[in-house]
């Protein structure tokens, strides 16, 4: 039994060892502290050949349906957030709803409330505006502005299945600048190009990116592509 007051790593290792019932195979990226604690319960083997990663990469039909389920909730939550922006009224360059400025926090709270009501949790949700959108993981703070790009990125997890979805959208209330339109078009075209050339394994998608990590033809940096 797990004892009250056990350190976090040891309690986690204790639980895993009980469930495993025998030797445990771990990937090279497995937390060292947890591996050390596991060794006090079960033999721990390093998966140098990448067998665990290969097993996780191929999803069963049941897993795919769980991912689709959380994705459907994610899409609906995203639409709730975008609807707040769509129905806002610009005043002096700032978006307003119900007589007060519409903020990143308000949009984030609306989406999180929907996610919670449908069995999911949102963490590290991004609702950034204007110059903040140049920072890849800026959460966003304060009033949203007219004619400025608003980046919304949500990464919910289903409370029961543990599976995640991930969705990002860029919207503008008003008229985007030519530079913003150009960047938007470059991303759209790059996505379409990648979809046409996609392969079964995700590592091949990464190989489609140029070695200098520039995304033709717009000449913009690709940003975070490590999770392709």
Question: Which residues fall in each region the model found?
Answer:
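Active-site neighborhoods and metal-handling regions in enzymes and metal-associated proteins
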Residues: 1-228
């Amino acid at each position: 039994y797990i004892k009250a007051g056990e350190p976090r790593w040891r309690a986690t290792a204790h639980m895993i060892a009980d469930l495993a019932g025998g030797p445990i195979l771990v990937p090279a990226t497995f937390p060292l502290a947890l591996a050390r604690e596991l060794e006090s319960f079960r033999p721990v083997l390093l998966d140098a050949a990448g067998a665990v990663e290969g097993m996780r990469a191929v999803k069963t039909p049941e897993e795919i349906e769980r991912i689709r389920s959380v994705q459907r909730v994610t899409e609906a939550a995203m639409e709730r957030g975008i609807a707040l922006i769509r129905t806002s009224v610009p005043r002096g360059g700032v978006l307003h709803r119900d007589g007060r400025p519409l903020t990143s926090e308000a949009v984030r709270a609306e989406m999180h409330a929907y996610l919670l009501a449908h069995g999911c949790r949102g963490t590290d949700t991004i609702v950034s505006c204007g110059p903040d959108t140049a920072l890849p993981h800026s959460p966003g703070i304060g009033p949203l502005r007219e004619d400025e790009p608003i980046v919304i990125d949500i990464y919910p997890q289903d409370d029961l299945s543990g599976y995640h979805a991930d969705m990002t959208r860029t919207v503008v209330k008003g008229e985007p600048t030519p530079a913003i339109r150009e960047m938007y078009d470059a991303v759209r075209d790059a996505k379409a190009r990648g979809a046409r050339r996609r392969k079964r394994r995700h590592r091949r998608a990464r190989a489609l990116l140029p070695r200098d990590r520039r995304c033709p033809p717009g000449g913009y940096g690709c940003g975070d592509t490590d999770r392709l």
